[in-house]
């Protein structure tokens, strides 16, 4: 069975009203996400498939979500592990090229498909495999991770996880497909959309890139168009294959991003166009009340973006 991923509109005024009781708004937002994690863990085990393929767009929180689902499965007494498709990159000097001559890391051909197919077949047949570990500092595979899901589940997460080319050598029902994305968009007093899910993901990405990857806003905004094009090309066409959906929206986060974006230092590398883009994004979040990150629990998925 496949499910349909539909957006839902939330009134900006309703968020403003709820933000008058910030602790309750945060708690409800967190509970909405964590209840889904628990439910998905139950559904995965009930389905009986050993392999779960999980995808979602950039900054949807798919990596953290994959590990939270794995933890929930483990808490139910079943072995669980997570494999990132990034570990199957073919390595420097072997990547396909973009039209401008740069390496294309988002193409399916950037992955070692032969090795990936071998791992998936081994997982399906025996429940175990030796998967590569990719070292990004030297841009090539370095080491092996032993995957053992003989009495449990392995979650494989990444950009191309729902692409049928990955599982074409397995029986059709060998893997359960899961899509993680944001469902909440926000409407103004005229019921017109004033904040889209892609805006929220961009805010998440800007903050994470700055705090953990050493990149200013110019770098993130410079890549964002390519990132979105890659999502449209490599993720959206396969979204209908999803058996399960995970909404990673946290309603109160729109109030957090207003605060965090306003406190990020200026990036002198911004072009005039990027400066206008960032100003427009900040203006969208400025329509919401400001809340501080101290509201965010230490076990929140949002900590992937703001840190501990």
Regions found by a protein language model. Give the residues of each.
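Charged, amphipathic alpha-helical linker segments immediately N-terminal to NTP-binding catalytic cores
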Residues: 1-39
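Conserved NTP phosphate-binding and transfer environment spanning the P-loop NTPase/kinase superfamily
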Residues: 7, 22, 27, 164-308
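Glycine-rich phosphate-binding loop used to anchor ATP phosphates in small-molecule kinases
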Residues: 46-48, 117-173, 220-238, 253
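Hydrophobic anchor at the beta1->P-loop junction of P-loop NTPases
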Residues: 52-54
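Conserved lysine of the Walker
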Residues: 62
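Post-Walker A helix-loop "phosphate-sensing" segment adjacent to the P-loop in P-loop NTPases
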Residues: 71-81
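Conserved nucleotide-sensing/catalytic segment adjacent to the nucleotide-binding pocket
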Residues: 81-83, 90-139, 153
